[in-house]
Amino acid sequence: MTVQLGAFYLFPLFMAGFVQTNSNLEKMDCYKDVTGTIYDYDAFTLNGNEHIQFKQYAGKHVLFVNVATYCGLTAQYPELNTLQEELKPFGLVVLGFPCNQFGKQEPGENSEILLGLKYVRPGGGYVPNFQLFEKGDVNGEKEQKVFTFLKHSCPHPSELIGSIGYISWEPIRVHDIRWNFEKFLVGPDGVPVMRWVHETPISTVKSDILAYLKQFKTE
Amino acid sequence: MTVQLGAFYLFPLFMAGFVQTNSNLEKMDCYKDVTGTIYDYDAFTLNGNEHIQFKQYAGKHVLFVNVATYCGLTAQYPELNTLQEELKPFGLVVLGFPCNQFGKQEPGENSEILLGLKYVRPGGGYVPNFQLFEKGDVNGEKEQKVFTFLKHSCPHPSELIGSIGYISWEPIRVHDIRWNFEKFLVGPDGVPVMRWVHETPISTVKSDILAYLKQFKTE
Amino acid sequence: MTVQLGAFYLFPLFMAGFVQTNSNLEKMDCYKDVTGTIYDYDAFTLNGNEHIQFKQYAGKHVLFVNVATYCGLTAQYPELNTLQEELKPFGLVVLGFPCNQFGKQEPGENSEILLGLKYVRPGGGYVPNFQLFEKGDVNGEKEQKVFTFLKHSCPHPSELIGSIGYISWEPIRVHDIRWNFEKFLVGPDGVPVMRWVHETPISTVKSDILAYLKQFKTE
Amino acid sequence: MTVQLGAFYLFPLFMAGFVQTNSNLEKMDCYKDVTGTIYDYDAFTLNGNEHIQFKQYAGKHVLFVNVATYCGLTAQYPELNTLQEELKPFGLVVLGFPCNQFGKQEPGENSEILLGLKYVRPGGGYVPNFQLFEKGDVNGEKEQKVFTFLKHSCPHPSELIGSIGYISWEPIRVHDIRWNFEKFLVGPDGVPVMRWVHETPISTVKSDILAYLKQFKTE
């Protein structure tokens, strides 16, 4: 099932000034020879009620984000809401994965995470408009399998991996996620397309996605 | 100025079944030859507005507690409210010191801590009825001076200090605080009287304080 | 079986100028209520050929030392030789336990340790004139049982335990050995008598032992 | 000054059975667009007497190796002697850099390293027939500049970087050297040509160098 994008939807957004095209240094195109798709993997929703097979997102453009409540980048959460809203018509689905491996900035239980987002940080009643999954590892021995697949389908994000004081997983690998709020875009066929470092502004992520959608449209 | 305790106030509480006397192993009587008092020290209130000199608590029985929002013992917070309420008439003042050194379970900024307590953990609208101070260290090179004084005025709480994965201070010392929610009782003369390990139930802390107040009264 | 000490042997040594009596701060008298003896424990000799039951030292005054080749204190090795030689007539037996837990300064295999001492540090053909045992842990989960017994039979040596960069055992305990070359003296009944911090000069250890032997003699 | 290689010297070695060509997975060809050469860097010899500018090796094929005495791979030392001897006629110069960053397996002082090699490991009177330099870092904030240049001139050697227990440098980077005995071959123009992981047998390193020399000869 492929997503039909009306070019005329894309163009206004592309030009609407929401989009600052940063250098591609931050965007990494994933490898061309990836075998397998995200459809081989699954996860429990944050409230533990639903076991979601990622193949349910076949045909969608899925943005995987490892998130945390008490991070200096937690302000990206509301921006992800905006991104989800704006690009939903184009088949974008944002998925959030709380993780406590980066400076232990997601200390809450699954049942506490939405409360923390709503009342503490970003606070002000914030509620994600995209699916969050159960807290889990994205690096190291107990990393969630979908993140093993995503990480090794794309170039590593930076020469710097981190400092021992903030690394709480074993072993340390080149393709490890560097910090909260790294992002992977997966195409409608379940194959990873792009990866962004955590500091990449959402606006850049958005413009990269729009450019990709446009190109996807013409192809 | 010494606190006049009506023995008849103490006795009912002592017997009222709220009190389970645990073995004294958990309570440690501080050293008799302590020099100096807490009145030499000070701290900023959690909101940063007030610089409090601890000598303002002269004549009070002050309970110092290092606290954290996302700790397995955070349920002690409401119990500390009850303790403060019940023993306020006897001159007890509870003081809370948020600290992120134990498993990094206090990741929030000062401005976020009360929100986390109110809405996330313990949540349910909880508001401490005692003073909280600015987040700070209680162990290691940058430990708050009052905690240096408190720790070295009393025996260390346990043979086990901890595991490297959860110790995020330097250097490691015998008298270091072991985890969130350790407690020190300071007498009305500013001299430390008792120290409890973090796991000590508040009910035991209460009965120890009542026994101490009773003895203090008769002396 | 008690060691008969000729007082006249002790006195000249005591006065011979080899002995500088340092403050007792460095010496710690072990606890009086110790149960058990070193005779419950054993170890393999460095070359692995012999399994030594410590009860074979019944009647002797045994000095346990955790040693390392590449330590700033390795110069104590030749001084331990001198100590063994001088106090052998009085029943002193020095036992060395190579250990790699302090800054990883004993990296060699058992078969390499004597070579390292002889040719590298202290070098110059040095050969210990006392028994060395197989390399093993003295702190943490896999610590040798005799060191668990020794450590908990005596006060801990210092408030400072160490810095995380140099601590490679789990968990961290108050009575842990602080560095290479700590020493425990055990009486002829197998019960620990004294403990010294690593920096204590051997001359001080010697004078403390002589004073103890003298007292032991009169008692 | 370029090295004239008599093809007839290369061919017999290439075929002489000393050479097992392993998969190139272990060999990494350095980047083509490297700017700068090793000639911009220098180091002090192990005994501290000589300050060597690497430009003195212009025209030579230089093999940089970070070494350690108490490593499971220290047996590569005698093999490096053989390599130096066999390929000296073809302009190969082996340079060894003792480093204590991998499991702290080079604890000795500069003055002790040759003693350790000669009498302990590999022992048996072993003396390197190639230049050793002063002990120093090859990763992290204080890494020697020549290793910064070498590491970033070639692909990183493996996805696995290591486990926190054995990493004693900050920060951790993708191109960091993984363990003792990694190797870099630098051409006669001072530009890095090849990099090998630490486990690569010296025989493979040799056959890779011979193949390179042969190709270098024909070009």
UniProtKB/Swiss-Prot annotation, chains A, B, C, D:
Q: What Pfam families has UniProt attached to this entry?
A: GSHPx
Which region is the signal sequence? 1-21
Residues at the catalytic site: C71
GO MF terms on file? glutathione peroxidase activity
State the compartments where it is located. Answer: Secreted
Keyword line: Oxidoreductase, Peroxidase, Secreted, Signal
E.C. code:
1.11.1.9
Reaction(s) catalyzed by this protein? 2 glutathione + H2O2 = glutathione disulfide + 2 H2O
Q: Which Gene3D superfamilies has this protein been placed in?
A: Glutaredoxin
Tell me, which GO biological process terms does this entry list? response to oxidative stress
Example GO CC term: the record gives: extracellular region
The tissues where this chain's protein is expressed are given as: Proximal caput epididymis.
Q: What does this protein do?
A: May constitute a glutathione peroxidase-like protective system against peroxide damage in sperm membrane lipids. Since the purified porcine enzyme has very little activity towards hydrogen peroxide or organic hydroperoxides the protective effect is not likely to be exerted by its enzymatic activity. Instead, may protect sperm from premature acrosome reaction in the epididymis by binding to lipid peroxides, which might otherwise interact with phospholipase A2 and induce the acrosome reaction.
Q: Which family does it belong to?
A: Belongs to the glutathione peroxidase family.
Quaternary structure and partners = Homotetramer.
What is this protein's name?
A: Epididymal secretory glutathione peroxidase
